[in-house]
């Protein structure tokens, strides 16, 4: 199991300057961005940076070369984690056309599953909800909305009698600039606590919105587990509470397929972040089925997120 691995990669902006490396006795730069690739164990706890290059997009050719080199030294690549900003990679592999895996070039019997980064997707859910608003089905042809004003209303109502969401503040909905890069504020907004607060303060008037927030929360917990066992089924490793975890993924799939944007309700075509969520759900189920054949019983899904930026700090 130690050789079962996932590739994650990220293209990061850097200060455009010229630097002299004293140890290598060479000059680097100027460069606007750096491409970093990391391999990490999916079952065993290890990770290693294997590629760094400047002004380099992740392409299909480069990715397959990296996979082949890993496989040659005995590392089995089962998945690839990335954010939705890798346009060249996404386009060349036709990921937005519902392609969620490719045959492994070293062993066509195994697949490499694509995983758009769950924290990045959560931030995009938050951004679109606050900026455009979501329109959600409420049965019998009716709809309800969920957007900035609804969260603002909750924040102002919470605390008048009892404060259910102590972490939720105006900063969570007035996010601009670099603040939008923080995953924790998006997680607070779409948390189980927020879901319960909507129900407590507004009763059945916000029943649909409360359920949607909880659906997002369960999906993110399922895609971000870091311990084998947890009091919350969705926070346990994937496979430990398989029935409830699979149900959480399919609930999110249904929610994403049915949601519309309040500024353009008639538009039914999915945009990039919605497709990314649907791809990640299909990949999680497919990857787990593949790993089961090798005797793997559970997966810590946090190892399927993009983690390269942490290595650069």
Located regions from the model:
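Non-catalytic regulatory appendages
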Residues: 34, 47-313
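Structured nucleic-acid-interacting core domains from mobile-element enzymes and related host factors
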Residues: 1-44
